């Protein structure tokens, strides 16, 4: 099992926002940038626009779980920042998962499945 390191430093978030590749929909925005390391780093951003603390924490837990379940498919050497938009608060788990997978596929973040 791969271990993803949390991304916490503000200057790293800023670097990913300014120099990373991005994809977005109505629920999530995904930023990806190479980090030159073997493993991945994950950052989550859920602003106060999403809702109160209970709602924001629920969204954060769902995003963390979605990433954890698909962690083996994620290509290494990437910094990933997931930004929850206000519509994420009213979305259920499956909608958020579909959204994440669609955006990750768009940014070529996931390993291609098929014969090797």
Can you say where each PLM-predicted feature lies in the sequence?
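Positively charged, solvent-exposed patches that mediate nucleic-acid binding
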Residues: 1-116
């Amino acid at each position: 099992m791969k271990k993803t390191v949390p991304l916490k430093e503000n200057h790293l978030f800023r670097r990913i926002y300014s120099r990373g590749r991005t994809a977005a929909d109505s629920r999530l925005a995904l930023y990806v940038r190479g980090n030159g390391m073997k493993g991945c780093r994950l950052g989550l951003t859920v602003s106060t626009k999403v809702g109160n603390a209970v709602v924001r924490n629920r969204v954060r837990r769902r995003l963390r779980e979605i990433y954890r379940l698909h962690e083996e498919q994620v290509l290494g050497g990437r910094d990933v920042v997931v930004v929850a938009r206000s519509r994420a608060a009213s979305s259920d788990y499956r909608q958020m998962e579909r959204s994440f997978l669609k955006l990750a596929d768009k940014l070529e973040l996931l390993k291609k499945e098929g014969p090797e």
